[in-house]
Every structure is written in C-alpha cells, then in structure tokens.
C-alpha cells in the first residue's frame, strides 16, 4: 500500500482528535466574527505553535510525510513536493515550518504525516480549522496533549453529532 492509499484509508475514520485554538465548541452568534478576528491577529503565532508541535513529533518518532494536491494554476515552488512525492518529513525543520505556515496561511493543499514505527498514526494539517490526529495510541496522545498544552492550544476529541 503506498503512502497516499494509507492516508486515504486512515482519513475514513470518524474517531480522531483535533487541535483547536478554543477549549470548547463555540456556538455563539459572533463565532465567525471572532474566528476572523483571531486569525487576523494571531495567524503567525498559530502557525508557529503548530510548527512546534509537528517538529517535536518528528524529533520523537520516525515519520513519512507528503503534500497533497494543489489547485489548478498554482505554479509556486512547493508544487514540486506533490508532483515528485517528496517525503516532507525528511526535510530540515525550518523548511517544514515554512510549509506549515504556507498551508495554514493560504488554506490550500495540505500536509499529511504518517508517524510512528509502523507509521500508523496520521497527523493531518488540512487548514486552520482542521488539524487532525487519527489512529493515535495512548503514548502518542499523551505526548501530543503535553505539546498542545505547552503551546496554549487544545487537544479535543471529535464527537460525531
């Protein structure tokens, strides 16, 4: 099974954790106004926090990673990472941090990391509101929880409504 097939299979799960900037689900009338305010004032900081979490996980665990498709017409430098199926988990940490900032700022493409000895946990950065951890064991969750708390973010379990 190639890396894209494994990622697709893991993404079919509806049991996962996600990283959020809010401690609880916000149902207030002004949520979208708050979200716009939060990211217009904190996007750089948020990108740095997510980068710190990912890079620390890559320091702890073996991993493989890929970028996903780019929109039609995108011709920037990062497109070759997808076109050539480059293992982004093996790039230097500064470059990985730049990629995370790119994905979270532009909100297109995504980064998918298979983490662990058997590469059975998926850390998926899809956009600002979709940073998911799928098929993580208790050891992974314990570490991720500590890293997320250290960065002032929240690890929440997805509950289907």
Task: List the model feature ranges, each with a label.
Residues 1-130, 134-161:
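Structured alpha/beta or helical-core interaction and ligand-binding surfaces enriched in interleaved
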């Amino acid at each position: 099974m190639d890396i894209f097939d494994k990622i697709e299979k893991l993404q079919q799960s509806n049991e996962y954790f996600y990283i959020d900037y809010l401690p609880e689900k916000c149902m207030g009338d002004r949520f979208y106004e708050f979200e716009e305010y939060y990211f217009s004032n904190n996007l750089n900081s948020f990108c740095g926090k997510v980068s710190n979490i990912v890079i620390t996980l890559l320091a702890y665990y073996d991993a493989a990673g890929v970028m996903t498709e780019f929109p039609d017409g995108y011709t920037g430098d990062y497109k070759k990472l997808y076109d050539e199926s480059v293992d982004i988990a093996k790039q230097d940490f500064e470059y990985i941090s730049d990629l995370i900032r790119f994905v979270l700022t532009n909100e297109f493409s995504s980064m998918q990391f298979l983490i662990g000895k058997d590469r059975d946990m998926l850390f998926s950065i899809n956009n600002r509101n979709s940073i998911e951890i799928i098929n993580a064991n208790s050891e992974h969750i314990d570490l991720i929880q500590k890293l997320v708390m250290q960065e002032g973010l929240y690890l929440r379990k997805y509950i289907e409504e």
